[in-house]
C-alpha cells in the first residue's frame, strides 16, 4: 500500500509533507508533488501534515480521483526527488479547495 497525492495539491504545492517523510519518497514537479509508490512505507506521517488535505492512503483515494494513483507512479519516475520543505506556490491559498485542477498540472 502507498499514499497518493491528489488533485488539491495542484497549484498549491505545500511541502509540509516532505519534511516529515522518513524515506524521502516525494518527487517535485513545477506545481504538484507526487509520492513514489515503491518507496513509500505507508507510515501515514505525511497525510495529516498536508494543509490542502490532498494526501490519501491508496485504498481511500476518492472515486473521482483514482487516476492520481497511476499519475503519482508515472511522474515519480521522471521528476526530481524533494527532501526539504520549500515555500508553497505564491497563489496557493487562492487555489486551495478549487475542484478539478488536473487540467492545470504542469509536467
UniProtKB/Swiss-Prot annotation:
Function summary: Ferredoxins are iron-sulfur proteins that transfer electrons in a wide variety of metabolic reactions.
A Pfam family that the UniProt record links to this protein: DUF3470
Keywords, comma-separated and alphabetical: 3Fe-4S, 4Fe-4S, Electron transport, Iron, Iron-sulfur, Metal-binding, Repeat, Transport
Cofactor note: Binds 1 [4Fe-4S] cluster. Binds 1 [3Fe-4S] cluster.
InterPro entries in UniProt: 4Fe4S_Fe-S-bd, 4Fe4S_Fe_S_CS, 7Fe_ferredoxin, Fd_C, FdxA, RnfB_subfamily
Single GO MF descriptor: metal ion binding
Residues bound to [4Fe-4S] cluster: 21, 40, 43, 46
Protein name per the record: Ferredoxin 1
Cofactor: [4Fe-4S] cluster; [3Fe-4S] cluster
Organism domain of life: Bacteria
Chain ranges of the 4Fe-4S ferredoxin-type domain: 2-30, 31-60
PANTHER family per the UniProt record, alphabetical: FERREDOXIN, OXIDOREDUCTASE
Residues bound to [3Fe-4S] cluster: 9, 17, 50
Amino acid at each position: 500500500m502507498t499514499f497518493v497525492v491528489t488533485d488539491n495539491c495542484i497549484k498549491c504545492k505545500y511541502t509540509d509533507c516532505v519534511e516529515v517523510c522518513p524515506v524521502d519518497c516525494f518527487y517535485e514537479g513545477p506545481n504538484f508533488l507526487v509520492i513514489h509508490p515503491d518507496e513509500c512505507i505507508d507510515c501515514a506521517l505525511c497525510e495529516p501534515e498536508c494543509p490542502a488535505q490532498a494526501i490519501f492512503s491508496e485504498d481511500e483515494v476518492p472515486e473521482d480521483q483514482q487516476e492520481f494513483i497511476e499519475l503519482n507512479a508515472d511522474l515519480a519516475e521522471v521528476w526530481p526527488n524533494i527532501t526539504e520543505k520549500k515555500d508553497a506556490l505564491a497563489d496557493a491559498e487562492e487555489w486551495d479547495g478549487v475542484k478539478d485542477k488536473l487540467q492545470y498540472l504542469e509536467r
